[in-house]
Amino acid sequence: LITIPEDYKSNNIPLNLQSRIKPFLSKNQNYWYDHPIPIDAFDHENEILYGLRHLDKALSIEFKRGNLKINEKISLILSLSVTHIGLEEIAFDYVKNKIREKLNLKFIDVFVFDENRTSKIINTLFPKNNDYEALFGVNGNYGRHYTFLKYALILWNKVINKSFKYSFKIDLDQVFDQNFL
């Protein structure tokens, strides 16, 4: 969940995004979510960085317990919803760069899907039927987002890795205390 900066003059807006984000100053918000991350958020306030960092830490404990093999990683699909139509590519670049610059994930391969990418999936699978876009995507009501995540495993299993047997959904503000568990 990504939104526009709280302060357009903030030094926390990545330089490569500053000019691209300015047109959104005058745009109305299209979608409302409970806790979107502003593009000018401090790193310690960024749920994506927080969640991925702690999930990777939890997986390191599972590795030490023998539940993951050497060089084995989980595939994590990150659904990237935005509050403003047109913000998708900016948000994609923002998230991609934050993960690359701030995290050294040892046990997670992250795959980011925004509305543009989910739309391409639907148009590829069903080129003559756009009705599915109302059901499958990451922006807007929770049902579309949930449907995307639910069917992502089926698509992943058919196209990427046939050995996948299960998936689960987490919010990145959740963490798992593996030492306690």
Please describe what each predicted stretch is.
Residues 9-11, 84-88, 177:
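Short catalytic/ligand-binding loop motif for oxyanion handling, primarily in non-cytosolic enzymes
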Residues 179-181:
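Acidic donor-diphosphate engagement hotspot in glycosyltransferases and nucleotidyltransferases
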